[in-house]
């Protein structure tokens, strides 16, 4: 059994670690609340854009924008959104597993894949994995802006415009609640049609464009893609802070359990040492 002094040192070390994890838990909780507010503030815009675009995809336009046209998938692109920092449980690895499974399915069908990665964890993972990373972005911090994402999104849109991509997806963690965050893959291009049954009927919905649809659609559809990627970044950030808070709480609780176990071992060691000393005193007295 280890000596009492050694056990005391271990207890002190674990207590120091526990203070760090507790502080990180509190910081993550504070950041989580702020990121949730940002996420909730941006959701109405992103949801409305998605709804409008879903209607456009069902519309009957004389001008058919390339983003509305279905074509055979020979090469697909993924915009993968991860965190910049670790210590957030299995948040990133679960996301990577999901996208890797889908990429494997495409590869088995002979479809090539391009990747744009946002977040240093995704950059490190796919550079190590060997994926064809054509754009990367990291260091967005806790207050990402749309302007910081335009370059990365623009690379993928340019490839789509030039016919080098036939599908474009965004991959990120979806914030369900503080206990549930799920990895999700959503199609950006070609534009997904509205799932509203009322809109599926012929001529159920159409817009009137003045003076003409082309310049409006050219700007609107690019803005739609950018808004969905931005919403993905904001949601992923909220998921990151929640996951880190939960991971640090678990670490703090585990440290408490270890301290209790070490304290028990320490008490036993101290008791054994006292018993040994008493035995030696009694033996000495008997000898005299």
Swiss-Prot record:
<keyword id="KW-0997">Cell inner membrane</keyword>
<dbReference type="GO" id="GO:0046933">
    <property type="term" value="F:proton-transporting ATP synthase activity, rotational mechanism"/>
</dbReference>
<dbReference type="GO" id="GO:0045259">
    <property type="term" value="C:proton-transporting ATP synthase complex"/>
</dbReference>
<keyword id="KW-0472">Membrane</keyword>
<dbReference type="InterPro" id="IPR035968">
    <property type="entry name" value="ATP_synth_F1_ATPase_gsu"/>
</dbReference>
<keyword id="KW-0066">ATP synthesis</keyword>
<dbReference type="GO" id="GO:0005886">
    <property type="term" value="C:plasma membrane"/>
</dbReference>
<keyword id="KW-0813">Transport</keyword>
<dbReference type="GO" id="GO:0005524">
    <property type="term" value="F:ATP binding"/>
</dbReference>
<dbReference type="InterPro" id="IPR000131">
    <property type="entry name" value="ATP_synth_F1_gsu"/>
</dbReference>
<dbReference type="GO" id="GO:0042777">
    <property type="term" value="P:proton motive force-driven plasma membrane ATP synthesis"/>
</dbReference>
<comment type="function">
    <text>Produces ATP from ADP in the presence of a proton gradient across the membrane. The gamma chain is believed to be important in regulating ATPase activity and the flow of protons through the CF(0) complex.</text>
</comment>
<protein>
    <recommendedName>
        <fullName>ATP synthase gamma chain</fullName>
    </recommendedName>
</protein>
<dbReference type="Pfam" id="PF00231">
    <property type="entry name" value="ATP-synt"/>
</dbReference>
<keyword id="KW-0375">Hydrogen ion transport</keyword>
<comment type="subunit">
    <text>F-type ATPases have 2 components, CF(1) - the catalytic core - and CF(0) - the membrane proton channel. CF(1) has five subunits: alpha(3), beta(3), gamma(1), delta(1), epsilon(1). CF(0) has three main subunits: a, b and c.</text>
</comment>
<comment type="similarity">
    <text>Belongs to the ATPase gamma chain family.</text>
</comment>
<keyword id="KW-0139">CF(1)</keyword>
<dbReference type="InterPro" id="IPR023632">
    <property type="entry name" value="ATP_synth_F1_gsu_CS"/>
</dbReference>
<keyword id="KW-1003">Cell membrane</keyword>
<keyword id="KW-0406">Ion transport</keyword>
């Amino acid at each position: 059994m280890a000596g009492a002094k050694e056990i005391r040192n271990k207890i002190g070390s674990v207590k120091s670690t526990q203070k760090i994890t507790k502080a990180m838990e509190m910081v993550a909780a504070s950041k989580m609340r702020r990121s949730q507010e940002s996420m909730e503030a941006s959701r109405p815009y992103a949801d409305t854009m998605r709804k409008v675009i879903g209607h456009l995809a069902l519309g009957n336009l004389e001008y058919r924008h390339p983003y509305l046209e279905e074509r055979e998938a020979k090469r697909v692109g993924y915009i993968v959104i991860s965190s910049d920092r670790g210590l957030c449980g299995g948040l990133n690895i679960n996301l990577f597993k999901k996208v890797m499974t889908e990429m494997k399915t495409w590869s088995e069908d002979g479809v090539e894949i391009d990747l744009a990665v946002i977040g240093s964890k995704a950059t490190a993972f796919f550079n190590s994995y060997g994926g064809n990373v054509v754009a990367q972005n990291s260091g967005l911090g806790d207050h990402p802006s749309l302007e910081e994402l335009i370059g990365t999104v623009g690379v993928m849109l340019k490839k789509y415009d030039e016919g080098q991509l036939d599908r474009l997806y965004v991959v990120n963690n979806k914030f369900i609640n503080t206990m549930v965050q799920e990895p999700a893959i959503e199609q950006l291009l070609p534009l997904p049609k509205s799932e509203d049954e009322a809109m599926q009927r012929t001529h159920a919905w159409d817009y009137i464009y003045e003076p003409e649809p082309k310049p409006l659609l050219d700007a609107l559809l690019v803005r739609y893609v950018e808004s969905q990627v931005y919403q993905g970044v904001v949601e992923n950030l909220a998921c990151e802070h929640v996951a880190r808070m939960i991971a640090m709480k678990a670490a703090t609780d585990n440290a408490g359990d270890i301290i209790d176990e070490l304290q028990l071992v320490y008490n036993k060691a101290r008791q054994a040492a006292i018993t040994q000393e008493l035995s030696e005193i009694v033996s000495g007295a008997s000898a005299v």
